[in-house]
UniProtKB/Swiss-Prot annotation:
Keywords: Lyase, Molybdenum cofactor biosynthesis. It catalyses: (8S)-3',8-cyclo-7,8-dihydroguanosine 5'-triphosphate = cyclic pyranopterin phosphate + diphosphate. Pathway: Cofactor biosynthesis; molybdopterin biosynthesis. NCBIfam families: moaC (TIGR00581), PRK09364.1 (NF006870). InterPro entries: MoaC (IPR023045), MoaC_bact/euk (IPR047594), MoaC_sf (IPR036522), MoCo_biosynth_MoaA/MoaC (IPR050105), Mopterin_CF_biosynth-C_dom (IPR002820). The active site is at 129. Belongs to the MoaC family. SUPFAM superfamilies: Molybdenum cofactor biosynthesis protein C, MoaC (SSF55040). One of its GO terms (biological process) is Mo-molybdopterin cofactor biosynthetic process. Substrate binds at residues 77-79, 114-115. This is Cyclic pyranopterin monophosphate synthase. Its EC number is 4.6.1.17. It comes from Alcanivorax borkumensis (strain ATCC 700651 / DSM 11573 / NCIMB 13689 / SK2). It comes from the Bacteria.
Amino acid sequence: MTEQRFTHLDDSGRAQMVDVTDKDITQRAATAQARVRMQPSTLQMILAGEHPKGDVLATARIAGIQAAKKTWDLIPLCHPLLLTGITVTIEPEADDALCVQATCKLKGTTGVEMEALTAASVACLTLYDMCKAVDRCMVIESVCLLEKSGGRSGTFRRER
């Protein structure tokens, strides 16, 4: 078994941006997920399009897309990436939650896991922000990477 190490630390333990100069360009994709739990009445208001702030779901999707593009600005050691695809979906779950899934794609030398995780997280934060006036008990939960493909480490799929 090969020794695992933190790639963002140099031999002296100092933070560094990983050098991907010599890595092969491959097709890469990642999908992340997060949930916002809320009062059933809040979810019904959103789904019926009756929220006073307008289309909550469209705003959250756009926020997630923007967040994926700005990940390198938010997470200090992330590379600026030329993403070729970003999809954010938001679906109701039971009577008290919205499930956000974000998928990011590119052809490049580094993965897009952080971009997908950031997109899902910020979409949930936007849902919270837009709905906090009517429901302060919301909970953002279960932020996780569902799958990734491409690159040296191959494919990962979370067991559901």
